[in-house]
């Protein structure tokens, strides 16, 4: 079941009460936003009608409209909790897509890496979650990753391994743990190894 609306904010996909756990003063009808971006609008119109259907899990691909907000990881946590509650299963898988590389128009160029950092933090906040990395699937010239098959395959690998029991698959992407510098070199340690695009193998 696909429910989507391009260019929307995460607040639109959750209840006002869930959003206020992160941002207590958020408005239900903020005139700054387009109609579809107001808090709970898409949740009421495009998620609630689906809750009588059986679902195995969720795939979430959003974030551009919330770039640079340092509460985004908490928003994701509340969104996953809300949706799981509506389906009555606190362990429903929640797999999401990392924002792909792209040259945004913010002067300092920090909104993308800060949002990716928030998405990475969400992995630790949301149990039974996973992130499909797009570091090698994007382009600085287009906001939509040109290697869409790669993105879809990585989401599928997460679901096959973690939800459907194909334990031998490699599904996670490399995840940074720490770095140290010595003798003019940077030695990077990863928490996990995993799948990478062909140019990195």
Description of each model-found segment:
Residues 1-201:
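Cell-envelope and extracellular/periplasmic
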